[in-house]
Amino acid sequence: MGSTGTAVARLAFMTELLRPLRGIVGPPVPIVPFHNWDYYYITQNLTWDPDTADKENYESVTAPRYFVTDLASIPEPFWSALPPTGPYSYPAIIHDWMYWTQPHARSGDDDRAYADGVLKLAMAELKVPALKAVAIYEAVRAFGAGAWAGNADARGGGEKRVLKRVPTDARTTWAEWKQNLDNFA
């Protein structure tokens, strides 16, 4: 393939990767940002139910109202292609809840693989473009162990992620809010 053909192929790949999703199916993602826009809380329960074909291997997952999430934990250098918010936000919130609570804690990496599998299925069910879904899934499989362990350590150290009350001042940061344990359920 000549240089023109290579350029056209790259352009087609990038066009597909960056194509906005239209016609997303499912509930809206009800989120409110903290001041720095690095953490958010959801304003109602969010539930993922596996499709019929997946019910044998996966259970429904519900992230509760006022759960605090960072949405998709995508490093800043990749934001032009995969911003932290996108059609994958709903699956990312469910995934964050599972990484926080680690509800299927059975034996090491299998637990994380289960949560990552839920993310993959939820993105497919919400018709996240395939290239974006694959990039996100492969990244969490390759690099998610640190977040999994960090969440277990934070929970063990007393950190909470479900709010009892929400900030009333738009200048409130997550770093400030999480210092007061009275803010949590």
Labelled PLM ranges:
Residues G2-A185:
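Extended terminal accessory/targeting regions
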